[in-house]
Amino acid sequence: MVCFFIGHRNADLSLMSQLESAVKNHIYGYGVTDFIVGQYGAFDRMAARAVINAKKIFPEVSLSILLPYHPYEREVCAPEGYDSTFYPPGMENVPRRFAIVRANQYMIKHCDYLIAYAWQPASNSRKLLELARRQPNITITELVRT
């Protein structure tokens, strides 16, 4: 079972406790073992930290970093605490300016669970949450703005 994260890049640190609870709930309640997170902004950093913290209790859990750009362009090693990188198939011909959104769309369409923090109406995070709501086989957990 794969869980992905979508959230605003300017998310406040006060969200961390909600993220940690959501990650643990997904491990305990849903049996999620694989988490994939982006690498742009505060929400992604907090989501990664929540999974890294959970891995101390649940060593079977893995964390991958989503690569929107082909690793051949710029080699990316998994940062400390991560287990691997993930570059979605079929992204090779996507123009760079669309790569982040396309990689996120791929994950929305191919994950089992989504943890989302998307309250800003005109944001890409919100658009991706709306896309997720139209997917038939995804369970969405929305974090509350504090």
Language model feature labels by segment:
Residues 1-2, 7-146:
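Acidic/glycine-enriched connector segments
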